[in-house]
Amino acid sequence: MAFKVGLLGLGTVGTGTVEILRDPAQRHPLLQELVIHKVGVRSLDKARSLNLSADLLTTDLDAIVTDPEIDIVVEVMGGLEPARSLILKALAHKKHVVTANKAAIARFGDEIFTAASEAGVYVLLEAAVGGGIPVIEPLKQSLCANRINTVIGIVNGTTNYILTRMQTEGGDFGEILADAQQLGYAEADPTADVDGLDAADKIAILASLAFSGRIKLSEVYCEGIRQIGAADIAYAEKLGFVIKLLAIAKRESDQQLQVRVHPTLVPKTHPLASVNDVYNAILIEGDPIGQVMFFGRGAGAGPTASAVVSDILNIAAILKVGRGQVTQADGTPLLDPLLACSHQHYCTIAPMSELVTRFYARFLTQDYPGVIGKLGTCFGDHQVSLESVVQAGIRDGLAEIVVVTHDVREGNFRKALDEIQRMTTVANIASVLRVL
Amino acid sequence: MAFKVGLLGLGTVGTGTVEILRDPAQRHPLLQELVIHKVGVRSLDKARSLNLSADLLTTDLDAIVTDPEIDIVVEVMGGLEPARSLILKALAHKKHVVTANKAAIARFGDEIFTAASEAGVYVLLEAAVGGGIPVIEPLKQSLCANRINTVIGIVNGTTNYILTRMQTEGGDFGEILADAQQLGYAEADPTADVDGLDAADKIAILASLAFSGRIKLSEVYCEGIRQIGAADIAYAEKLGFVIKLLAIAKRESDQQLQVRVHPTLVPKTHPLASVNDVYNAILIEGDPIGQVMFFGRGAGAGPTASAVVSDILNIAAILKVGRGQVTQADGTPLLDPLLACSHQHYCTIAPMSELVTRFYARFLTQDYPGVIGKLGTCFGDHQVSLESVVQAGIRDGLAEIVVVTHDVREGNFRKALDEIQRMTTVANIASVLRVL
Ligand SMILES: NC(=O)c1ccc[n+]([C@@H]2O[C@H](COP(=O)([O-])OP(=O)(O)OC[C@H]3O[C@@H](n4cnc5c(N)ncnc54)[C@H](OP(=O)(O)O)[C@@H]3O)[C@@H](O)[C@H]2O)c1
Ligand SMILES: NC(=O)c1ccc[n+]([C@@H]2O[C@H](COP(=O)([O-])OP(=O)(O)OC[C@H]3O[C@@H](n4cnc5c(N)ncnc54)[C@H](OP(=O)(O)O)[C@@H]3O)[C@@H](O)[C@H]2O)c1
């Protein structure tokens, strides 16, 4: 049997994908039954590292997603449009889809999965989160007996690289970002990474799978790492923490989830604390499995293509054994309930003001004896119980005060901060971070 | 639809399995379509923590595996016989099988998978390695596009617990084993764990999946942790290592694998070095994914039952969508080429003498100036190049000498040791360990 694959995109991931497809030795024998039928790109003139026969390449992507010969469309072009429209059109033409596009899935997952269900085809997306690290398929299949309670991930390699270097070198965010850009670890426009948007896309996808509901991306709280200073890294270190950009999804109650991305103080003994450089890791806590963690490279041509091609093979295996021969009343093939994303309702996400967490905050204040007392009283007035208040030093003639709270309601903490902000003795709230 | 499950065994894992099956809330909805049809045990009189209706329990296990109503047989009784015969009989009666029995699969995998292929049914075994940690399914599905080069695991919780305590407390093997037995972390008869046999079963299974061939268990080299002394842990620590019982499978060439279990010096910076206590982790290195690691609890009722029930659900999902409706010429359902273990040939395992590795060795010798020179010359004569030789101290009036080699052929190293053993100046080769 031969399964025909149409690729949309031949950039980093597309090239990695073709390289695996053309080199099946010592890989799964099913690879030999895959045929690259067409590859869609923007420009036919671009120099390519791969030696592809010219008649495979086309700029007519519409022709790929409607080609009656193609079984599986692989979307590795990225971006929102035309990626979204092409995926929907491929599904309408009853093609299975494999995609690495977290941005499109996080935003248009509802339309895309509804269209897939109606067409009786699969949309697989292992590459969209954690690069090659298996996490989508484990959530769907290997962990399906569990009640998932928490998913916590380091899912953005660029920010983890920057934070790791800030940690080891003691440098400031701006200079290390500039260096990371030079070295190719950060994009020229770093916004999606450093402002946490990419991580937010990914945790929205993971939360949707873990809690079997749809997630409105606009409800995912998202805070990046631009405001982290060398001082915060150093104080955190002294307190026994490292700072990581965490993407967190948590079942708060039967009705509500927390879904959020923000830099977080992580205890050094926590399994995520030692995940450094561009590595990603996803920690899942479920009942009755307890904690499991998945670790590896979250990006790059090889790891990402590993996930893309594995998804293609999983679909080829289904096609081969004729799964989908059982049909529903309207003739649509019945989809595997573990592999399809058939949930329809939206999860309710709790507002951040209701979050209960520990906080770390750093204040610059006038250097006189009553200040710590004033801060303490203000927090107390708002039911914010403190674990420690330390005058850590003097900076620019101001006293630097570091506060760590016990578990408190974020809403209460914010009200106290509002009041502190207005105190004439407080020059600056230099940083506010949550503690895991 | 309802899928009928027959359980063989209601001990630790069986009880955990029933607990999940009876509590589907917030778990995958497919759970609600599973029905426990029969549960086989040894004794009907035994007090059970579960309140199971009496007509479910039976001591007639044969009747379960031949019951025409049962779709899926779950073998969680353990041991070699009658487990093997019951599994084979279940397969002959075209029942899908889920098992947690690493001992039986490592020994009888060839018979069992051949019988499953002939019957056109699946044998799933996620629980057999790493408890709840997804590793079998990722190897079969999520990583299937890769050429796997290495699998290295900490796959035995008991030995990892003992070694971690030896590391943190500085105690000796014997006393910590006794304490571990008291605390329930080690069995009364600890042989299978501390002599590495359980880890050997597991790496044989992982190697078979990673390298798509069968493995003769008798060819798996296996060395336990009884001989590790507090002195070795302390010297390793000074050299920047921790000692872990590693199970290793490696592609040495197109023709040959290494498959081995032994205590190993692991650099403290290695991802496996910080896997402590009863936790397990499996590190897989593949092309093009690079390194990925899976971490979690490798045993216990909850984690193991998570894997067992997930396997049951995976089979139920297949049954539900009617996969297997495409049949071969003889009418047997065609099995999913990713999920079935259809490889027939045996892998060739290289003899240990051909292994190229670094070694650590500790000698007790007479305390006079020429001894280090004699050792060095002897190693040199056998092409064993040394990284360091240190007289580490005096023990019982003897000089304690610690040697670390560069990468050397194990055969050469052993010949040198034979010669050293016979030197009158050398009282004792106190320990020999490999270095990762
Ligand atoms: N790179 C990674 O490490 C990584 C990791 C995980 C997920 N992903 C995801 O994978 C996807 C692809 O990423 P990438 O890094 O491979 O991107 P890339 O290197 O920029 O490649 C994009 C490819 O798509 C083609 N393309 C883009 N827009 C097109 C259009 N409108 N019409 C026709 N062709 C178009 C480009 O054609 P030309 O070649 O002619 O310009 C190029 O071949 C993205 O969704 C990304 O988020 C990437
Ligand atoms: N425990 C773990 O953490 C763990 C982790 C991974 C894998 N596993 C594997 O899971 C399997 C089960 O382990 P377990 O710890 O659950 O064992 P267990 O607690 O000893 O339970 C064994 C069960 O099987 C029944 N049984 C045993 N031999 C029988 C026979 N000949 N006829 C009828 N019933 C028989 C026993 O019946 P009675 O109740 O009447 O005595 C008991 O219910 C083993 O293969 C083990 O290697 C266990």
Language model feature labels by segment:
Chain A
Residues 312, 318-436:
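A conserved regulatory-domain signal marking ACT and ACT-like small-molecule sensing domains
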Residues 176-274, 279-281, 300:
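Substrate-binding/catalytic subdomain of NAD(P)-dependent oxidoreductase enzymes
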Residues 83-89, 93, 102-140:
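Rossmann-fold NAD(P)-binding glycine/threonine-rich loop
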Residues 117-198, 205:
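Rossmann-like NAD(P)H-binding beta-loop-alpha module
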Residues 292, 296-302:
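Glycine-rich phosphate/pyrophosphate-binding beta-alpha loops
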Residues 42-44, 78, 102-103, 110, ...:
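Short, ordered loop/turn segments at secondary-structure junctions
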Residues 96-98, 386:
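A short hydrophobic/small-residue beta-strand
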